[in-house]
Amino acid sequence: MSDELSPEVFDAVCRQADQAARAQERLAQANTEAKNELLLAIADALDEHAADIEAANALDMLESKENGMDAGKLDRLLFDVPRVAAAAQGVRHVATLPDPVGEIVRGYNLPNGLRLTQTRVPMGVIGMIYEARPNVTVDVASLCLKSGNAALLRGGHAAERTNAATLGVIAPVLEAHGFESALVQSVDQYGRAGATAMMEARGHIDVLVPRGGAGLIQAVVRNSKVPVIETGAGNVHIYIDKSGDLAKAIPIIINAKTQRVGVCNAAEKLLVHKDVAAEFLPQIAAALAEANVVLQTDTTSYGIISGAAIEGLDLNHAAEEDWDTEYLALKMGIKVVSDLDAAIDHINTHSTGHTESIIAEDYAAIEEFTKRIDSAVVMVNASTRFTDGGVFGFGAELGISTQKMHARGPMGLREMTTTKWIGYGTGQVRA
């Protein structure tokens, strides 16, 4: 289908959103036990039909390989039986988490006796636009259902068969438990026009969350008429302070850069204090070369590393645009900085506000870094790969928000609710 939005597609997507809203009204009244039973049944169904989902995914993988998709994106696209099983286990974990709906955030009595309470309630219809991430379909469905929300999904062409197979498993479970299948729907049948319609559907969709590369995220932020929660691309930094334990730093960097290169919490830039650069850079360059990581370096780093005669090294001069680039590949930018202030200034200038890490033993340096870095997550002597809803104990995540309004960092169940105020009176009137 053409990317251009026709009135017919817009009307169809709005009808789907309205169906989702009506179904969500029923879900919002469901108790925690009913929602947990639903989630456990969905997890069992995913396990039962994992081979069918894998078969659909194999077709998506084959087409994407033929279309030249890079290795990082192919890794995200893969949804084989083990990954389906992991997703199902994530759904079970969501069922064990506290239900945020109905939680009293605060409450107090006014001098006139009026009792005020601020209570957590579902957002309503959450729209999700993402690309080549079939696990997100399961994650979003489970989080939305537990938090009392409906989900309207645009999962992208690359994963269209996989997502359809996954939703085909979830829909009958919803109906078997007395809920409408409209609670979790896809607009993939409309191609990119479906995403455009979602961005236009203000008044039908309550909030829109993009999850993908920087281009996708910025396109949604710029063009959406629906309120957006921005999940950020990850131009993620690790800073090696002069007080850092260099032996500790090497495995942290290798893990952060190479464990999964196509994810937003993978490290992209390495900043090294000048006092330890001569000692540390040849060591880390050798370790990165062994992992087939291409190095984009500033002049000082280049001079130090090039003199070390490291076998298999792919060493290059960094261009200015490198410092703002999320590679999502076996590539890393390296820069020597004069001091902690210079590292913080560089990060706050070039970061996307996702995750940064400091390797240091000096408490004052750690405190300065954690206070001044303007990102959603700051790690100390740990890999940036820990920025993840599952790792944080959320079971799954809607995304990792890099904005400051509503939610910041990994978005779990609580971040998928809003609040309402309820006033309990005994006849009070305002003078």
From Swiss-Prot:
Gene Ontology, cellular component aspect: cytoplasm
Keyword Cytoplasm: yes
EC numbers, comma separated: 1.2.1.41
UniProt keyword list: Amino-acid biosynthesis, Cytoplasm, NADP, Oxidoreductase, Proline biosynthesis
Pfam families per UniProt: Aldedh (PF00171)
GO molecular function, one term: glutamate-5-semialdehyde dehydrogenase activity
Catalytic activity: L-glutamate 5-semialdehyde + phosphate + NADP(+) = L-glutamyl 5-phosphate + NADPH + H(+)
Name of the protein in question: Gamma-glutamyl phosphate reductase
Lineage: Bacteria, Bacillati, Actinomycetota, Actinomycetes, Bifidobacteriales
